[in-house]
Swiss-Prot record:
The gene is obg. It holds the Pfam family GTP1_OBG. An essential GTPase which binds GTP, GDP and possibly (p)ppGpp with moderate affinity, with high nucleotide exchange rates and a fairly low GTP hydrolysis rate. Plays a role in control of the cell cycle, stress response, ribosome biogenesis and in those bacteria that undergo differentiation, in morphogenesis control. This is GTPase Obg. It is found in: Cytoplasm. Keywords: Cytoplasm, GTP-binding, Hydrolase, Magnesium, Metal-binding, Nucleotide-binding. Residues 161-338 form the OBG-type G domain. The keyword GTP-binding applies. GTP binds at residues 167-174, 192-196, 214-217, 284-287, 319-321. GO terms for molecular function: GTP binding; GTPase activity; magnesium ion binding. Its cofactor is Mg(2+).
Length: 437
């Protein structure tokens, strides 16, 4: 039996940009040659791509870290480093990608061959050619490559199906799917034979078709995680029409009406919008003795429980075993699909902003100041830390440039206003220097 995995937590780390070079021309007949250090190449991004051949997230169970390659360093004679190739990670169709820390949805991958940059590679550092000015025609300044984005992502897989079969275990969902579609699910005379969603293509009439999914049996408390409830309910979210399968036989000793109410309560508790989907009641196993009598009792209870303005739900009498009553059910299902639009899982406007953005967000202030336990001062913040990482401290001019940029950010003024004294230690990441007032 193949395992099914519909959630995974992974780390994606894009490649660092290549360092820029400090170099000078050393050519015959060219005295006092100018700067010749090239730029570093860009780091490789991590890109998710939909693969229709994948049906689970099992590949991410043991392979949880994906790293892009770094760009090459800049070279002499103004030659730029080669950019790294992007890392393509294949995911199944229907995968939702979320930021693990915030829970924000980054993208919903539902289109064939759809791609999305989940971690952008760092840009290459500039070589000293870029820093030449009339006042300083031969600078010994170059940048280190920009670090690539590093994220923890949560992947959730929801099967892509138009119609979902819901109901308690052993009510005949798998049998029904097997006789109306090309699916061949495992069928057994015991509960939870189906532990993964089965999908089949259903042909109706001339040319009409739709995808039907047999959802594993639900139990009371599924919305709060009882059994494997949340995993199963997640897959129903993409469907447009629900077929609620009820067992009208006496084999399991169940009450069809209580089953009907319990399953709908679970759907509503998990996600209110699931109850907005058209739902057909499928009275299954009508070939069994006493089935007609039990169906009549079900209809009486259902009618008595309806509000004054509620219409009686549509009920179809079928037998998956003898294949009776199925054509009418499928025809009505096809009609409802034609009338029912897709239900959006996420707000398109909010999702659009996330999809369009690949870079680093600007903070209101480029740095923050805090105190260490020993009384030293610590600078932090994405902007100033990135500036620090991209500074090449092997060259004095680069160090002086970094100091000027710190002053331009207002670091000196802020430290002074917070009480920093001459000789106090100031730290940024693992680097330490003395404050000079």
């Amino acid at each position: 039996m193949s395992l099914f995995l519909d959630t995974a937590r992974i780390e994606v780390k894009a490649g660092k940009g290549g360092d820029g070079a400090v170099a000078f021309r050393r050519e015959k007949y060219v005295p006092d040659g100018g700067p010749a250090g090239g730029d570093g190449g860009k780091g490789g991004s991590v890109i998710f791509k939909v693969d229709e051949g994948m049906s689970t997230l099992m590949d991410f169970r043991y392979n949880r870290i994906f790293r892009g390659k770094p760009g090459e360093k800049g070279m002499n004679k103004g030659m730029h480093g080669r950019g790294a190739e992007d890392l393509i990670v294949h995911v199944p169709q229907g995968t939702t990608v979320k930021d693990n820390e915030t829970g924000d949805v980054l993208v919903d991958l539902i289109e064939k061959d759809q791609e999305f940059v989940v971690a952008k590679g760092g840009r290459g550092g500039r070589g000293n050619i870029r820093f030449a000015t009339p006042r300083n025609p031969a600078p010994e300044v170059a940048e280190n490559g920009e670090p690539g984005e590093d994220k923890i992502l949560l992947l959730e897989l929801r099967v892509l199906a138009d119609v979902g079969l819901v109901g308690f275990p052993s009510v005949g969902k798998s049998t029904l799917l097997s006789v109306v579609s090309n699916a061949r699910p495992k069928i057994g005379a015991y509960h939870f034979t189906t532990i993964t969603p089965n999908i089949g293509m259903v042909q109706v009439g001339y040319g009409d078709s739709f995808v039907m999914a047999d959802m594993p049996g639900l139990i009371e408390g599924a919305h709060s995680g009882a059994g494997l409830g949340i995993q199963f309910l997640r897959h129903i979210e993409r469907t447009r029409v629900l077929l609620h399968i009820l067992d009208m036989s006496e084999l399991e000793g169940r009450d069809p009406y209580e089953d009907y109410k319990t399953i709908n309560d679970e759907l509503e508790s998990y996600n209110l919008r699931l109850m907005e989907r058209p739902q057909l009641i499928v009275a299954n196993k009508m070939d069994m003795p006493e089935a007609a009598e039990r169906l009549a009792e079900f209809k009486e209870k259902l009618a008595a429980d309806l509000e004054a303005d509620q219409e009686m739900p549509e009920i179809f009498e079928v037998s998956g075993l003898t294949k009776t009553g199925l054509q009418g059910l499928l025809a009505r299902t096809s009609e409802l699909l034609a009338q029912t639009p897709e239900f959006l899982l996420y707000d398109e406007d909010a999702l659009g902003d996330e999809v369009a953005y690949y870079g680093f967000e600007d903070e209101e202030k480029p740095f923050k100041v805090s105190r260490d336990d020993d009384g030293g001062w610590r600078l932090s913040g994405e902007k100033i830390e990135k500036l620090f990482i991209m500074t090449n401290f092997d060259h004095d001019e680069s160090v002086m440039k970094f100091a000027r940029q710190m002053r331009a950010f207002g670091v000196d003024e802020t430290l002074r206003s917070m009480g920093a004294k001459d000789g106090d230690y100031v730290r940024i990441q693992k680097f330490e220097f003395e404050f000079v007032d």
